[in-house]
């Protein structure tokens, strides 16, 4: 198949992997759409998205509309005379008028095995749910949220200790590879597209920092999965003196729960880490980040602060009362 005339819409690192793969395989990317530069970091300086940085390095025209609703951006896209628009983690709604513009429509790389985990955060939701596998789906876009016909999918096992960041990187590479495969014979894949099944639909709602606050009344496995899933964003935490203490890494303890163990209280502190009671056992916290400090292994942290955590005391302000309110603020 001859090289396609494409535009690419994407924003984060996950999307940049796909853009690089498309460029490496000789397709003509005539424009890149990415979200406007956003203020980020402590200095709140404007940051270019990874996709914009890659596009600039390749001399590709970059478009950064606040949305895709206006006639001006519609005319710009019509003038590109596209064979297809590739959309990967763009972050803006694609209206029907834009979906209808390219000759062969719009394609999307989605980091799950659809219809499971439609939506914004499929990678993290798969881990929090305790899924043992996930994958990527290349689909033809339509107006619904990740509802379009599937062109190609491939599964990927989730490691027992894999973090959201680690799984993200493996899925980004897999998605890029599958995208290139589809683009090599796009019309054949479109002709053989498969509707998504009506069974097994779940939604991967957007992540928030508030939900990353740990409730130690949950089972150990659920807490462990949350800590893995939310590394490196939004990062699990509990309040310590009114500020978030981040929990980067933990492991499940084999010790069963004791009748008098109160969730959120420290059971022991040793070379493994801080053993904290949960709803059905205990969790070993192995890497923490105190407010305003860098992340550290608990063993290193305790060398400089041996009395920071005391057995029989709650972990920071981690206790939640029976009404569901937290005893501390963040």
UniProtKB/Swiss-Prot annotation:
Annotated binding of (6S)-5,6,7,8-tetrahydrofolate, by residue: 112-115
Identify the SUPFAM superfamilies for this entry.
FMT C-terminal domain-like, Formyltransferase
- From the UniProt record, list the reaction(s) this protein catalyses: L-methionyl-tRNA(fMet) + (6R)-10-formyltetrahydrofolate = N-formyl-L-methionyl-tRNA(fMet) + (6S)-5,6,7,8-tetrahydrofolate + H(+)
In the UniProt record, does the keyword NAD occur? no
Can the keyword Cytoplasm be found in this entry's annotation? no
Molecular functions (GO terms): methionyl-tRNA formyltransferase activity
Q: What does this protein do?
A: Attaches a formyl group to the free amino group of methionyl-tRNA(fMet). The formyl group appears to play a dual role in the initiator identity of N-formylmethionyl-tRNA by promoting its recognition by IF2 and preventing the misappropriation of this tRNA by the elongation apparatus.
Q: Which family does it belong to?
A: Belongs to the Fmt family.
What name is this protein filed under?
Answer: Methionyl-tRNA formyltransferase
From which source organism is this entry? Alcanivorax borkumensis (strain ATCC 700651 / DSM 11573 / NCIMB 13689 / SK2)
The gene coding this protein: fmt
